[in-house]
Amino acid sequence: MAIARGPGTEIIRCHNFEDVNDTGIPLIVGVQHHIYTVLSIVVHADVLNAAGDYARCYLVGYDSFGAATGQRIYIFRQDMQVAGSFVWNDKFSFNGGEPTDFSGTMDSEADQNLISDQAVSTSQTLYFNGEHSADRFDIVVTFIDQNNA
């Protein structure tokens, strides 16, 4: 049976990635009028160029402080050891689409509503990358996808 994922639905999703290196890969590609709640990101270091090479996760999206589009908002950077794992299980949410741009820092209810409305189709995307091209990480990300279209 197919999973219903139309307007008004909420589903749990899980994405798996193997042998990820220093190239930034999207873990979750946002869709306008969706809200994503990340439940966990599990990272395992299979191979490292050097002990202590980092694993990093960041969101590319709208900066509500600087009122700028397409900005990197860092979630975590973790130094890793070969055969070691890191579990990020602090829940956080992000909108699938960027808001209509506003001037300056978000400082009003109107600005806050613009962020929630996601009136621009520019995607906000959660990324992962390692420190070095020789690094290899396996990643599992589990999240809730709320479709408010």
List each model region and its residues.
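C-terminal interaction-tip segments
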Residues: M1-H33, L48-A55, L114-A149
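Surface-exposed loop/edge segments in extracytoplasmic proteins
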Residues: E10-C14, F65-F76
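Solvent-exposed, conformationally flexible loop/turn segments
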Residues: N16-T23, D79-N89, G97
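Short amphipathic, basic-aromatic surface patches that mediate peripheral association
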Residues: V43-V47
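Short, surface-exposed beta-strand/strand-loop-strand elements in extracellular ectodomains
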Residues: N49-A67
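Beta-sandwich interaction modules
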Residues: N89-S123
